[in-house]
Amino acid sequence: MTAGHILYLIRISIENIIILSAPMLIIALIVGLLISIFQAITSIQDQTLSFIPKIIVILLVIVIFGPWILNKLMQFTYMIFSQLQNV
């Protein structure tokens, strides 16, 4: 296993982390922004108001994107284990 091969595996791993976490992070960002705008408009200063909607929305995103995330993780795991033959 060469240094180039290890760097390739690290790059692929980081790409997968970014791609698989992006739906949850983007949706949480949008929900947080909308709740912040709502709080600014209504002058509500409760810091805990944004947590429950974010948790609910992230759970919904996990339910919706869960099969896709699981499929990508299985493909990545299969690729990593197939690379072990080259060691």
Swiss-Prot record:
Topology within the bilayer:
Multi-pass membrane protein
Q: Which residues cross the membrane?
A: 17-37, 50-70
Q: Which residues, if any, are the signal sequence?
A: none
Q: What is its main location?
A: membrane
Q: Name one GO cellular component term.
A: bacterial-type flagellum basal body
Q: Which InterPro entries does the entry mention?
A: Bac_export_3, FliQ
Q: Does the keyword Iron apply?
A: no
Please list the GO biological process terms of this entry. bacterial-type flagellum assembly; protein secretion
Provide the protein's localization: Cell membrane; Bacterial flagellum basal body
The record's keywords, sorted A to Z, are: Bacterial flagellum, Cell membrane, Membrane, Transmembrane, Transmembrane helix
User: Is NAD tagged as a keyword?
Assistant: no
State the family named in the UniProt similarity comment for this chain: Belongs to the FliQ/MopD/SpaQ family.
Chain's role = Role in flagellar biosynthesis.
- What protein am I looking at? Flagellar biosynthetic protein FliQ
What's the source species for this entry?
A: Borreliella burgdorferi (strain ATCC 35210 / DSM 4680 / CIP 102532 / B31)
Classification lineage: Bacteria, Pseudomonadati, Spirochaetota, Spirochaetia, Spirochaetales
Task: Give the gene symbol.
Answer: fliQ
